[in-house]
Protein backbone atom coordinates (compact mmCIF):
# COMPACT_ATOMS: atom_id res chain seq x y z
CA UNK A 1 0.00 0.00 0.00
CA UNK A 2 1.39 3.45 -0.87
CA UNK A 3 2.36 5.77 1.99
CA UNK A 4 -0.02 8.53 2.95
CA UNK A 5 0.95 11.93 1.63
CA UNK A 6 0.92 14.60 4.28
CA UNK A 7 -0.86 17.83 3.56
CA UNK A 8 -2.88 16.40 0.66
CA UNK A 9 -6.32 15.91 2.16
CA UNK A 10 -8.01 16.23 -1.22
CA UNK A 11 -5.97 13.57 -3.03
CA UNK A 12 -7.86 11.22 -5.31
CA UNK A 13 -6.91 7.77 -6.54
CA UNK A 14 -7.71 6.49 -10.01
CA UNK A 15 -7.68 3.16 -11.82
CA UNK A 16 -5.14 2.89 -14.63
CA UNK A 17 -7.39 0.39 -16.42
CA UNK A 18 -10.81 2.07 -16.47
CA UNK A 19 -10.25 5.56 -15.04
CA UNK A 20 -12.56 5.10 -12.03
CA UNK A 21 -11.81 7.69 -9.31
CA UNK A 22 -12.00 6.93 -5.58
CA UNK A 23 -11.13 8.85 -2.43
CA UNK A 24 -8.79 6.19 -1.02
CA UNK A 25 -6.36 3.56 -2.23
CA UNK A 26 -7.47 -0.06 -2.69
CA UNK A 27 -5.80 -3.19 -4.00
CA UNK A 28 -8.66 -3.96 -6.38
CA UNK A 29 -10.70 -1.56 -8.51
CA UNK A 30 -14.36 -1.78 -7.53
CA UNK A 31 -15.46 -0.70 -11.02
CA UNK A 32 -13.56 -3.05 -13.35
CA UNK A 33 -12.20 -5.66 -10.91
CA UNK A 34 -8.53 -5.29 -11.90
CA UNK A 35 -5.86 -5.75 -9.20
CA UNK A 36 -2.89 -3.47 -8.43
CA UNK A 37 -4.04 -0.72 -10.78
CA UNK A 38 -4.95 2.04 -8.28
CA UNK A 39 -2.55 4.97 -8.03
CA UNK A 40 -2.67 8.47 -6.62
CA UNK A 41 -4.05 10.95 -9.11
CA UNK A 42 -1.87 14.04 -9.21
CA UNK A 43 -4.12 16.14 -11.35
CA UNK A 44 -3.68 19.39 -13.17
CA UNK A 45 -3.98 22.77 -11.51
CA UNK A 46 -7.45 23.56 -10.22
CA UNK A 47 -7.18 27.00 -11.82
CA UNK A 48 -6.34 30.47 -10.50
CA UNK A 49 -7.51 31.61 -7.09
CA UNK A 50 -9.83 34.56 -6.72
CA UNK A 51 -7.02 36.83 -5.59
CA UNK A 52 -4.96 36.04 -8.69
CA UNK A 53 -7.70 36.82 -11.19
CA UNK A 54 -7.15 39.75 -13.50
CA UNK A 55 -9.38 42.79 -13.80
CA UNK A 56 -10.85 41.48 -17.02
CA UNK A 57 -12.91 38.38 -16.27
CA UNK A 58 -13.40 37.31 -19.88
CA UNK A 59 -14.43 38.58 -23.30
CA UNK A 60 -17.92 38.01 -24.63
CA UNK A 61 -19.33 38.56 -28.11
CA UNK A 62 -23.08 38.99 -28.70
CA UNK A 63 -24.48 36.12 -30.74
CA UNK A 64 -26.06 38.38 -33.35
CA UNK A 65 -22.70 40.10 -33.99
CA UNK A 66 -21.14 36.84 -35.14
CA UNK A 67 -22.94 37.02 -38.49
CA UNK A 68 -20.54 39.60 -39.86
CA UNK A 69 -17.32 38.41 -38.21
CA UNK A 70 -17.64 34.64 -38.37
CA UNK A 71 -15.97 32.98 -41.35
CA UNK A 72 -17.37 29.85 -43.00
CA UNK A 73 -15.89 26.57 -41.81
CA UNK A 74 -12.94 25.69 -44.02
CA UNK A 75 -12.17 22.03 -44.57
CA UNK A 76 -9.20 20.44 -46.29
CA UNK A 77 -9.97 17.25 -48.17
CA UNK A 78 -7.54 14.51 -49.07
CA UNK A 79 -7.74 11.82 -51.73
CA UNK A 80 -8.93 9.30 -49.12
CA UNK A 81 -12.65 9.85 -49.64
CA UNK A 82 -13.55 7.36 -46.91
CA UNK A 83 -11.56 9.36 -44.37
CA UNK A 84 -13.08 12.64 -45.56
CA UNK A 85 -16.54 11.12 -45.14
CA UNK A 86 -15.89 10.10 -41.53
CA UNK A 87 -14.39 13.50 -40.69
CA UNK A 88 -17.55 15.18 -41.96
CA UNK A 89 -16.16 16.43 -45.26
CA UNK A 90 -12.51 17.06 -44.52
CA UNK A 91 -10.03 18.25 -41.89
CA UNK A 92 -11.08 21.30 -39.85
CA UNK A 93 -8.33 23.68 -38.63
CA UNK A 94 -7.72 23.79 -34.85
CA UNK A 95 -9.57 20.50 -34.38
CA UNK A 96 -8.51 17.75 -31.98
CA UNK A 97 -9.12 14.18 -33.17
CA UNK A 98 -8.73 10.98 -31.14
CA UNK A 99 -8.24 7.72 -33.08
CA UNK A 100 -8.49 4.42 -31.18
CA UNK A 101 -8.09 0.80 -32.16
CA UNK A 102 -6.56 -2.54 -31.23
CA UNK A 103 -2.77 -2.92 -31.48
CA UNK A 104 -1.73 -3.91 -35.00
CA UNK A 105 -5.09 -3.09 -36.55
CA UNK A 106 -3.57 -0.43 -38.84
CA UNK A 107 -3.97 2.92 -37.04
CA UNK A 108 -0.42 4.08 -37.74
CA UNK A 109 -0.63 2.92 -41.36
CA UNK A 110 -3.88 4.81 -41.92
CA UNK A 111 -2.59 8.02 -40.35
CA UNK A 112 0.74 7.86 -42.19
CA UNK A 113 -1.13 7.53 -45.48
CA UNK A 114 -3.46 10.37 -44.47
CA UNK A 115 -0.50 12.55 -43.48
CA UNK A 116 1.04 11.99 -46.90
CA UNK A 117 -2.21 12.91 -48.65
CA UNK A 118 -2.61 16.12 -46.64
CA UNK A 119 1.06 17.03 -47.18
CA UNK A 120 0.61 16.67 -50.94
CA UNK A 121 -2.42 18.98 -50.64
CA UNK A 122 -0.12 21.66 -49.24
CA UNK A 123 -0.59 21.26 -45.48
CA UNK A 124 2.53 21.46 -43.35
CA UNK A 125 2.41 18.03 -41.69
CA UNK A 126 4.32 16.72 -38.69
CA UNK A 127 4.28 13.05 -37.61
CA UNK A 128 5.54 12.51 -34.05
CA UNK A 129 5.96 8.93 -32.89
CA UNK A 130 6.47 7.89 -29.30
CA UNK A 131 6.58 4.19 -30.15
CA UNK A 132 9.01 4.10 -33.10
CA UNK A 133 12.20 5.85 -34.06
CA UNK A 134 12.07 8.21 -37.02
CA UNK A 135 14.10 5.73 -39.07
CA UNK A 136 11.50 3.03 -38.41
CA UNK A 137 8.69 5.34 -39.52
CA UNK A 138 10.76 6.09 -42.63
CA UNK A 139 11.01 2.36 -43.42
CA UNK A 140 7.26 1.98 -43.06
CA UNK A 141 6.69 4.97 -45.33
CA UNK A 142 9.03 3.42 -47.93
CA UNK A 143 7.05 0.17 -47.85
CA UNK A 144 3.90 2.21 -48.55
CA UNK A 145 5.66 4.19 -51.33
CA UNK A 146 5.31 7.39 -49.28
CA UNK A 147 8.98 8.11 -48.57
CA UNK A 148 9.09 10.98 -51.08
CA UNK A 149 6.20 12.94 -49.55
CA UNK A 150 6.96 16.21 -47.68
CA UNK A 151 6.23 14.97 -44.15
CA UNK A 152 8.39 15.96 -41.19
CA UNK A 153 9.08 13.06 -38.82
CA UNK A 154 9.93 13.19 -35.14
CA UNK A 155 10.31 10.80 -32.23
CA UNK A 156 9.80 11.95 -28.65
CA UNK A 157 7.75 11.13 -25.57
CA UNK A 158 8.37 14.21 -23.42
CA UNK A 159 5.36 16.52 -23.52
CA UNK A 160 7.48 19.67 -23.00
CA UNK A 161 9.72 18.78 -25.96
CA UNK A 162 6.71 17.99 -28.15
CA UNK A 163 4.98 21.29 -27.34
CA UNK A 164 8.24 23.17 -27.97
CA UNK A 165 8.56 21.49 -31.37
CA UNK A 166 4.96 22.27 -32.25
CA UNK A 167 5.38 25.90 -31.16
CA UNK A 168 8.49 26.24 -33.32
CA UNK A 169 7.21 24.44 -36.42
CA UNK A 170 3.55 25.58 -36.25
CA UNK A 171 2.34 22.78 -38.57
CA UNK A 172 -1.14 22.67 -40.09
CA UNK A 173 -1.48 19.03 -39.01
CA UNK A 174 0.32 17.18 -36.22
CA UNK A 175 -0.13 13.45 -35.56
CA UNK A 176 0.87 12.15 -32.11
CA UNK A 177 1.33 8.35 -32.03
CA UNK A 178 0.43 7.54 -29.30
CA UNK A 179 -1.05 9.51 -26.40
CA UNK A 180 -0.30 6.63 -23.98
CA UNK A 181 3.46 7.05 -24.50
CA UNK A 182 3.55 10.79 -23.75
CA UNK A 183 4.60 11.88 -20.27
CA UNK A 184 4.74 15.22 -18.51
CA UNK A 185 7.27 16.11 -15.81
CA UNK A 186 4.53 18.07 -14.05
CA UNK A 187 2.63 14.87 -13.23
CA UNK A 188 4.14 12.44 -10.72
CA UNK A 189 3.07 9.15 -12.29
CA UNK A 190 4.27 6.71 -14.92
CA UNK A 191 3.58 7.20 -18.65
CA UNK A 192 0.28 5.70 -19.74
CA UNK A 193 -1.47 6.27 -16.41
CA UNK A 194 -4.75 8.13 -16.18
CA UNK A 195 -3.11 11.30 -14.89
CA UNK A 196 -0.47 11.37 -17.62
CA UNK A 197 -2.93 10.69 -20.43
CA UNK A 198 -5.30 13.38 -19.20
CA UNK A 199 -2.51 15.93 -18.78
CA UNK A 200 -1.07 15.26 -22.25
CA UNK A 201 -4.47 15.40 -23.93
CA UNK A 202 -5.31 18.65 -22.13
CA UNK A 203 -2.07 20.37 -23.14
CA UNK A 204 -2.18 19.21 -26.77
CA UNK A 205 -5.86 20.09 -27.21
CA UNK A 206 -5.25 23.54 -25.73
CA UNK A 207 -2.38 24.07 -28.16
CA UNK A 208 -4.61 23.07 -31.09
CA UNK A 209 -7.28 25.64 -30.16
CA UNK A 210 -4.73 28.37 -29.54
CA UNK A 211 -2.53 27.87 -32.58
CA UNK A 212 -4.94 26.62 -35.26
CA UNK A 213 -3.02 23.36 -35.70
CA UNK A 214 -5.11 20.24 -36.20
CA UNK A 215 -3.99 17.59 -33.70
CA UNK A 216 -4.56 13.85 -34.20
CA UNK A 217 -4.00 11.70 -31.11
CA UNK A 218 -3.65 7.93 -31.41
CA UNK A 219 -5.02 5.93 -28.47
CA UNK A 220 -4.91 2.25 -27.55
CA UNK A 221 -8.07 0.44 -26.53
CA UNK A 222 -8.82 -1.80 -23.57
CA UNK A 223 -10.02 -5.39 -23.80
CA UNK A 224 -13.60 -4.05 -23.62
CA UNK A 225 -12.97 -2.02 -26.80
CA UNK A 226 -12.87 1.40 -25.11
CA UNK A 227 -10.00 3.85 -25.52
CA UNK A 228 -7.59 3.31 -22.62
CA UNK A 229 -7.40 6.14 -20.12
CA UNK A 230 -9.97 8.47 -18.59
CA UNK A 231 -13.23 9.10 -20.44
CA UNK A 232 -12.65 12.82 -19.96
CA UNK A 233 -10.16 12.66 -22.87
CA UNK A 234 -13.02 11.84 -25.24
CA UNK A 235 -14.86 14.92 -23.95
CA UNK A 236 -11.82 17.15 -24.55
CA UNK A 237 -11.43 16.38 -28.24
CA UNK A 238 -13.73 17.35 -31.11
CA UNK A 239 -13.82 13.98 -32.86
CA UNK A 240 -13.48 10.39 -31.65
CA UNK A 241 -12.83 7.68 -34.25
CA UNK A 242 -12.54 3.93 -33.74
CA UNK A 243 -10.61 1.76 -36.19
CA UNK A 244 -12.22 -1.69 -36.13
CA UNK A 245 -11.56 -5.04 -37.75
CA UNK A 246 -10.59 -8.63 -37.17
CA UNK A 247 -6.97 -9.73 -37.49
CA UNK A 248 -7.89 -12.48 -39.97
CA UNK A 249 -10.12 -10.23 -42.06
CA UNK A 250 -8.77 -7.81 -44.64
CA UNK A 251 -11.54 -5.24 -44.12
CA UNK A 252 -11.18 -2.35 -41.68
CA UNK A 253 -13.95 -0.01 -40.51
CA UNK A 254 -13.22 3.57 -39.42
CA UNK A 255 -16.20 4.57 -37.27
CA UNK A 256 -17.02 8.01 -35.90
CA UNK A 257 -18.62 7.94 -32.45
CA UNK A 258 -18.32 11.68 -31.81
CA UNK A 259 -17.90 14.54 -34.26
CA UNK A 260 -18.54 18.21 -33.56
CA UNK A 261 -18.08 19.02 -37.25
CA UNK A 262 -20.01 16.20 -38.90
CA UNK A 263 -22.31 13.24 -38.50
CA UNK A 264 -21.66 10.78 -35.69
CA UNK A 265 -21.84 7.03 -36.40
CA UNK A 266 -20.44 7.59 -39.90
CA UNK A 267 -18.19 4.84 -41.23
CA UNK A 268 -15.42 4.52 -43.77
CA UNK A 269 -14.43 1.14 -45.19
CA UNK A 270 -10.86 0.16 -46.03
CA UNK A 271 -9.14 -3.00 -47.23
CA UNK A 272 -5.71 -3.96 -45.91
CA UNK A 273 -3.32 -4.89 -48.71
CA UNK A 274 0.42 -5.32 -49.12
CA UNK A 275 0.67 -1.64 -50.07
CA UNK A 276 -1.30 -0.35 -47.11
CA UNK A 277 -4.95 0.51 -46.74
CA UNK A 278 -7.07 0.89 -49.86
CA UNK A 279 -10.43 2.62 -49.59
CA UNK A 280 -13.61 0.74 -50.48
CA UNK A 281 -16.01 3.19 -52.12
CA UNK A 282 -18.81 0.65 -52.66
CA UNK A 283 -18.75 -1.59 -49.57
CA UNK A 284 -22.18 -3.13 -50.19
CA UNK A 285 -21.09 -4.66 -53.48
CA UNK A 286 -17.82 -5.86 -51.96
CA UNK A 287 -19.40 -7.47 -48.89
CA UNK A 288 -21.96 -9.29 -51.03
CA UNK A 289 -19.53 -10.29 -53.80
CA UNK A 290 -18.45 -13.43 -51.92
CA UNK A 291 -21.95 -14.46 -50.89
CA UNK A 292 -22.02 -17.40 -53.29
CA UNK A 293 -24.97 -19.75 -53.71
CA UNK A 294 -27.88 -18.91 -51.35
CA UNK A 295 -28.21 -21.31 -48.44
CA UNK A 296 -30.50 -21.83 -45.48
CA UNK A 297 -29.91 -19.27 -42.73
CA UNK A 298 -28.66 -16.54 -45.06
CA UNK A 299 -30.39 -13.28 -45.95
CA UNK A 300 -29.45 -9.68 -46.79
CA UNK A 301 -30.07 -6.74 -44.46
CA UNK A 302 -30.51 -3.23 -45.87
CA UNK A 303 -28.89 -1.10 -43.20
CA UNK A 304 -27.68 2.44 -42.61
CA UNK A 305 -24.33 3.33 -41.08
CA UNK A 306 -24.21 7.06 -40.41
CA UNK A 307 -25.45 8.56 -43.67
CA UNK A 308 -24.39 5.60 -45.82
CA UNK A 309 -26.72 2.78 -46.91
CA UNK A 310 -25.03 -0.58 -46.51
CA UNK A 311 -26.20 -4.05 -47.52
CA UNK A 312 -24.72 -6.91 -45.51
CA UNK A 313 -25.35 -10.62 -45.26
CA UNK A 314 -26.77 -12.03 -42.04
CA UNK A 315 -25.89 -15.68 -41.42
CA UNK A 316 -27.55 -17.99 -38.89
CA UNK A 317 -27.01 -21.61 -37.94
CA UNK A 318 -29.36 -23.60 -35.70
CA UNK A 319 -28.42 -27.11 -34.58
CA UNK A 320 -29.35 -29.56 -31.78
CA UNK A 321 -27.34 -28.86 -28.65
CA UNK A 322 -25.38 -31.67 -26.96
CA UNK A 323 -25.26 -29.62 -23.75
CA UNK A 324 -27.84 -29.08 -21.05
CA UNK A 325 -27.60 -25.32 -21.63
CA UNK A 326 -27.80 -24.44 -25.35
CA UNK A 327 -25.19 -22.07 -26.71
CA UNK A 328 -25.94 -18.61 -28.11
CA UNK A 329 -23.00 -17.20 -30.08
CA UNK A 330 -23.03 -13.82 -31.86
CA UNK A 331 -20.41 -12.08 -34.00
CA UNK A 332 -21.09 -8.54 -35.19
CA UNK A 333 -24.41 -7.98 -33.41
CA UNK A 334 -25.73 -7.46 -29.89
CA UNK A 335 -26.13 -10.74 -27.99
CA UNK A 336 -28.90 -9.26 -25.84
CA UNK A 337 -30.79 -8.30 -28.97
CA UNK A 338 -30.49 -11.86 -30.29
CA UNK A 339 -31.88 -13.21 -27.01
CA UNK A 340 -34.84 -10.85 -27.36
CA UNK A 341 -35.58 -11.94 -30.95
CA UNK A 342 -35.45 -15.60 -29.91
CA UNK A 343 -37.83 -14.90 -27.00
CA UNK A 344 -40.30 -13.06 -29.26
CA UNK A 345 -40.21 -15.89 -31.82
CA UNK A 346 -40.99 -18.41 -29.08
CA UNK A 347 -43.65 -16.37 -27.25
CA UNK A 348 -45.45 -14.75 -30.20
CA UNK A 349 -44.84 -17.19 -33.06
CA UNK A 350 -44.57 -20.53 -31.21
CA UNK A 351 -41.18 -21.30 -32.78
CA UNK A 352 -39.15 -23.17 -30.19
CA UNK A 353 -35.39 -22.76 -29.88
CA UNK A 354 -35.00 -24.56 -26.55
CA UNK A 355 -32.48 -27.38 -26.83
CA UNK A 356 -30.91 -25.78 -29.91
CA UNK A 357 -27.56 -24.04 -30.34
CA UNK A 358 -27.92 -20.73 -32.18
CA UNK A 359 -25.07 -19.01 -34.04
CA UNK A 360 -25.40 -15.59 -35.69
CA UNK A 361 -22.76 -13.87 -37.81
CA UNK A 362 -22.58 -10.59 -39.71
CA UNK A 363 -20.50 -11.38 -42.80
CA UNK A 364 -17.49 -9.23 -43.61
CA UNK A 365 -16.44 -8.46 -40.04
CA UNK A 366 -18.93 -5.61 -39.64
CA UNK A 367 -20.56 -4.64 -36.35
CA UNK A 368 -24.23 -3.77 -36.70
CA UNK A 369 -25.93 -1.70 -33.99
CA UNK A 370 -29.17 -0.82 -35.79
CA UNK A 371 -32.42 -2.21 -34.41
CA UNK A 372 -33.59 -2.22 -38.05
CA UNK A 373 -31.69 -5.50 -38.40
CA UNK A 374 -34.27 -7.30 -36.22
CA UNK A 375 -36.38 -8.50 -39.15
CA UNK A 376 -33.35 -9.76 -41.09
CA UNK A 377 -32.12 -11.64 -38.01
CA UNK A 378 -35.55 -13.21 -37.50
CA UNK A 379 -35.64 -14.24 -41.17
CA UNK A 380 -32.20 -15.86 -41.01
CA UNK A 381 -33.10 -17.72 -37.79
CA UNK A 382 -36.35 -19.08 -39.24
CA UNK A 383 -34.59 -19.98 -42.48
CA UNK A 384 -31.89 -21.88 -40.58
CA UNK A 385 -34.30 -23.71 -38.28
CA UNK A 386 -36.83 -24.67 -40.95
CA UNK A 387 -34.16 -25.40 -43.58
CA UNK A 388 -35.59 -22.85 -46.01
CA UNK A 389 -33.56 -21.02 -48.63
CA UNK A 390 -34.64 -17.39 -48.99
CA UNK A 391 -34.61 -16.23 -52.63
CA UNK A 392 -31.49 -14.21 -53.37
CA UNK A 393 -33.39 -11.16 -54.70
CA UNK A 394 -34.90 -10.35 -51.26
CA UNK A 395 -33.66 -7.82 -48.70
CA UNK A 396 -35.02 -7.21 -45.20
CA UNK A 397 -35.27 -4.40 -42.67
CA UNK A 398 -37.54 -3.57 -39.75
CA UNK A 399 -37.54 -3.34 -35.96
CA UNK A 400 -39.26 -6.04 -33.91
CA UNK A 401 -40.95 -5.05 -30.63
CA UNK A 402 -41.62 -7.26 -27.62
CA UNK A 403 -45.26 -7.49 -28.65
CA UNK A 404 -44.22 -8.96 -31.98
CA UNK A 405 -45.09 -5.84 -33.97
CA UNK A 406 -42.76 -4.78 -36.79
CA UNK A 407 -42.00 -1.10 -36.45
CA UNK A 408 -40.91 1.39 -39.07
CA UNK A 409 -37.31 2.61 -39.31
CA UNK A 410 -35.63 5.68 -40.73
CA UNK A 411 -34.05 6.48 -44.11
CA UNK A 412 -36.19 3.99 -46.01
CA UNK A 413 -35.60 5.70 -49.36
CA UNK A 414 -31.83 5.31 -49.05
CA UNK A 415 -32.20 1.63 -48.20
CA UNK A 416 -34.48 0.97 -51.19
CA UNK A 417 -32.22 2.83 -53.62
CA UNK A 418 -29.15 0.90 -52.48
CA UNK A 419 -31.02 -2.40 -52.76
CA UNK A 420 -32.19 -1.66 -56.30
CA UNK A 421 -28.72 -0.48 -57.33
CA UNK A 422 -27.31 -3.89 -56.41
CA UNK A 423 -30.00 -5.81 -58.28
CA UNK A 424 -32.47 -6.75 -55.54
CA UNK A 425 -36.10 -6.95 -56.63
CA UNK A 426 -38.12 -7.51 -53.43
CA UNK A 427 -38.09 -5.96 -49.96
CA UNK A 428 -39.66 -7.25 -46.76
CA UNK A 429 -40.30 -4.19 -44.60
CA UNK A 430 -42.64 -2.70 -41.96
CA UNK A 431 -46.02 -1.20 -42.82
CA UNK A 432 -46.26 2.37 -44.14
CA UNK A 433 -43.12 1.93 -46.23
CA UNK A 434 -43.39 4.71 -48.78
CA UNK A 435 -42.64 3.69 -52.34
CA UNK A 436 -40.00 5.70 -54.15
CA UNK A 437 -40.88 6.80 -57.66
CA UNK A 438 -38.72 5.38 -60.41
CA UNK A 439 -37.50 2.37 -58.41
CA UNK A 440 -38.05 -1.05 -59.93
CA UNK A 441 -38.43 -2.85 -56.61
CA UNK A 442 -41.41 -4.60 -55.02
CA UNK A 443 -42.20 -3.86 -51.36
CA UNK A 444 -43.93 -6.41 -49.09
CA UNK A 445 -45.20 -4.80 -45.89
CA UNK A 446 -45.47 -6.71 -42.59
CA UNK A 447 -47.65 -5.72 -39.64
CA UNK A 448 -46.28 -8.18 -37.11
CA UNK A 449 -43.76 -10.99 -36.78
CA UNK A 450 -46.37 -13.77 -36.77
CA UNK A 451 -47.74 -12.82 -40.19
CA UNK A 452 -44.16 -12.49 -41.46
CA UNK A 453 -43.32 -16.00 -40.21
CA UNK A 454 -46.39 -17.45 -41.90
CA UNK A 455 -45.50 -15.71 -45.13
CA UNK A 456 -41.89 -16.86 -44.93
CA UNK A 457 -42.97 -20.46 -44.39
CA UNK A 458 -45.78 -20.58 -46.95
CA UNK A 459 -45.93 -17.67 -49.33
CA UNK A 460 -42.44 -16.50 -50.19
CA UNK A 461 -41.76 -19.16 -52.83
CA UNK A 462 -39.59 -21.12 -50.43
CA UNK A 463 -37.16 -23.73 -51.70
CA UNK A 464 -36.60 -26.73 -49.49
CA UNK A 465 -32.97 -27.81 -49.52
CA UNK A 466 -33.89 -31.43 -49.98
CA UNK A 467 -35.39 -30.55 -53.37
CA UNK A 468 -32.29 -28.85 -54.74
CA UNK A 469 -31.02 -32.04 -56.31
Stretches found by the model and what they are:
Residues 5-17, 21-87, 92-100, 105-112, ...:
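Peripheral, non-AAA+ core regions of ATP-driven protein-machinery
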Residues 125-129:
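Conserved RecA-like ASCE P-loop NTPase motor core of nucleic-acid helicases/translocases
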Residues 130-136:
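Conserved Walker A/P-loop ATP-binding site and its immediately adjacent core
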Amino acid sequence: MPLAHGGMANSNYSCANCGNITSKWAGRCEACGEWNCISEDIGLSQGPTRSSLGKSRGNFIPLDDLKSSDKPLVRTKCDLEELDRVLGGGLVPASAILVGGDPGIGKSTLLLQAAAKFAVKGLKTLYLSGEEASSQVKLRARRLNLDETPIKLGSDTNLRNILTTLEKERPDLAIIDSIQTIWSDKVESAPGTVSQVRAAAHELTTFAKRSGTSIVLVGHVTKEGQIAGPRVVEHMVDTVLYFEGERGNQFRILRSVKNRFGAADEIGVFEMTGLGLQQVTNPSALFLSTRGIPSAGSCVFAGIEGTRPLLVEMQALVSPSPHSQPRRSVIGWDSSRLAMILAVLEARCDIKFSGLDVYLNVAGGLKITETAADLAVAASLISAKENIIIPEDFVFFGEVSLSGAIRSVGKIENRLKEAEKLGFKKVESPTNTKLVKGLNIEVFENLDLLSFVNKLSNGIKKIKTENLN
